[in-house]
Amino acid sequence: MPNPFSKLQSHSLPGNLFASVVNDSQIIIESRTNEKKHFSTFDLKSGNLILETTSQTLTPWHSLVGIKNQYLIIQYFENKKNPDLASHFLYNQQTDEMMDELNYFSNTTQFSIPTLYLSESPDFPLFQQFIDQKIVLGCEYQEYGNKIIMSYYLQVSNEYIRRLRILVDRKIVYDEVQDDGLTGFAPGSFFTFKNRLIFVQDKKEFNIYEI
């Protein structure tokens, strides 16, 4: 049968994934290497990479939290011992400049995240039966029309492998390793937004699928 998914983009990020934000036309990824921050901007419709930059001005205490017009919204923790004290600034990705401070920030564009089921959940044995493998730690599950998207963990020696599985009309069309060598469970394996499935493999390989 033909694959009901269309891969729009697979791109190796310059660092490990740290944050992601979306609006109606773009998705922007923040990745990090040591003290450096990198921003990768993709067109949501085509999946094409529009712009990728490395900041020379932002510190580890600056984080990507939103988009406003052509600017990124950056959160800055003023007091490193008190995370409640934070301010928000507009940031120009092209010029690497902090712009105006925002008096108010609310992220109104939300992507859809899967439901989390930890191993202690009473429903977890049902997922073990459904996947037909001895899964551990937890799984993330989302239904999207006639599609089921889920990530699950398998134990190999003292480490864990996370796999991503996609079913259409209850038939498996995708089942691949998403990460290996893990030491525990980490949520946020994938999300969906406007008929797009978005996930990262091996901490750096960014993928956009049309679903």
Positions of PLM-derived features:
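Repeated scaffold domains used in trafficking and secretory/extracellular systems
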Residues: 8-23, 55-70, 97-143, 180-195
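Hydrophilic extracytoplasmic domains
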Residues: 170-211
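Beta-propeller blade signature
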Residues: 40-43, 86-96, 161-170
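A broadly used, surface-exposed interaction patch
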Residues: 48-93
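Short beta-strand elements that form the blades of beta-propeller/WD-repeat-like
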Residues: 18-33, 40, 69-83, 97, ...
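N-terminal "mature head" segments of proteins
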Residues: 1-47, 51
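Eukaryote-biased, non-catalytic alpha-solenoid scaffold regions
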Residues: 47, 80, 128-134, 141, ...
